[in-house]
Amino acid sequence: PPANSPRHCQMPAIPLRRSDMPRVFDHGARSYPLILGHEFSGVVDKVGEGVVSLSAGDHVVAAPLLPCGVCEDCLNGNYSLCSHYSFIGSRQNGAMAEYVVVPEANVVKIPNSLAMEQAATIEPATVALHAFKTSRFTAGKSVAVVGCGIIGLYAVQWARILGASEVTAIGRGQNGLDAALRVGADRAVSTSGRTEKEMQGLLGDGFDYVFECSGADATIHLAIATVAKKGTVCLIGTPKQPLSFTVSQWEAINRKECWVTGSWMSYSAPFPGEEWTDSVRCMCSGELCSDPGLVYGVYPMSQAQAAFEAIRSGAAKGRVLLTNEL
């Protein structure tokens, strides 16, 4: 392996992300051929020359971002904003293989007692925590989380861990809403069959912080409609379609003088950041968990095509994981 690059043997599991679907089915890969997989846990197989913090046999997770390290954003610790980055699983080969090469700086050790399937979901936990840091969250405030996928469920848990006064989960699918209650939401409200006005009537307009984890037109509108005056809307979800706003929807931002901020990826100084070390710590302590009720299926690597098809067809109503045998 290259200097300062440990080599990892991939262990169960490598979660499939919906963001990978365009790369597989819609010519969305940046280059071809490309091995996907940016969320993973593993066991160090070999270490490169000069590696001092890792040894063969260590259980680890790894941050997929490969920042340049020399631009102004990197020097300021804003690695997520690096314009010259590479990324494991999208800009270079990822973890859906027997081995993947990762720089030493990207690797975070985990205890052997932490299940690999659980550890493999740490990356979305770091994304959720980064949003709380970006939005300058303070304890004692009310939180709404819009969208109950994996990042939304971790946002619910971080809200509780970081001292929110109350946590409301908002979503469409009942599985996600049920999971949100299991992991710590005080209440879960379904958007199914309800207009924005009806939702606002149910929720009011008093949330101090709203974390939008879907990226859909309607959920962004709802986040703005239900945030408190002088409150904060943090946009985590990535839109897949053009967005539109009515005059009154946009004017609500002005009239409430609310703060709308984006949050991108999950890194801070020293790289990869507290987002990663805190997520590992809280997962090991049991404060943070990946709800098992949201796992649709576990597939061996030899059945990867079937796993991707389950997501594309809509059959998968939860997380899909690929596994490797050691």
Where does each model-flagged region fall?
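NAD(P)H dinucleotide-binding glycine-rich loop of Rossmann-like/cofactor-binding domains
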Residues: 68-146
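Glycine-rich cofactor phosphate-binding loops and adjacent beta1-alpha1 units
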Residues: 135-139, 178-258
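C-terminal hydrophobic helical "lid"/dimerization subdomain
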Residues: 221-225, 274-326
